[in-house]
Amino acid sequence: MDIISLAWAALMVVFTFSLSLVVWGRSGL
């Protein structure tokens, strides 16, 4: 596993996590 794929995986995780936080925030939780 090279550094490029590792960086992409981390970026997708952070993006998904922040997106879910925004959705939760707008839901009023």
UniProtKB/Swiss-Prot annotation:
Keywords: Chloroplast, Electron transport, Membrane, Photosynthesis, Plastid, Thylakoid, Transmembrane, Transmembrane helix, Transport. It comes from the Eukaryota. The chain crosses the membrane at residues 3-23. GO terms for cellular component: chloroplast thylakoid membrane; cytochrome b6f complex. InterPro entries: Cytochr_b6-f_cplx_su8_sf, Cytochrome_b6-f_cplx_su8. It is a single-pass membrane protein. SUPFAM superfamilies: PetN subunit of the cytochrome b6f complex. The gene is petN. Its main location: plastid. This is Cytochrome b6-f complex subunit 8. Belongs to the PetN family. It is found in: Plastid, Chloroplast thylakoid membrane. It holds the Pfam family PetN. Component of the cytochrome b6-f complex, which mediates electron transfer between photosystem II (PSII) and photosystem I (PSI), cyclic electron flow around PSI, and state transitions. The lineage of its organism: Eukaryota, Viridiplantae, Streptophyta, Embryophyta, Tracheophyta. One of its GO terms (molecular function) is electron transporter, transferring electrons within cytochrome b6/f complex of photosystem II activity. The 4 large subunits of the cytochrome b6-f complex are cytochrome b6, subunit IV (17 kDa polypeptide, PetD), cytochrome f and the Rieske protein, while the 4 small subunits are PetG, PetL, PetM and PetN. The complex functions as a dimer. One of its GO terms (biological process) is photosynthesis.
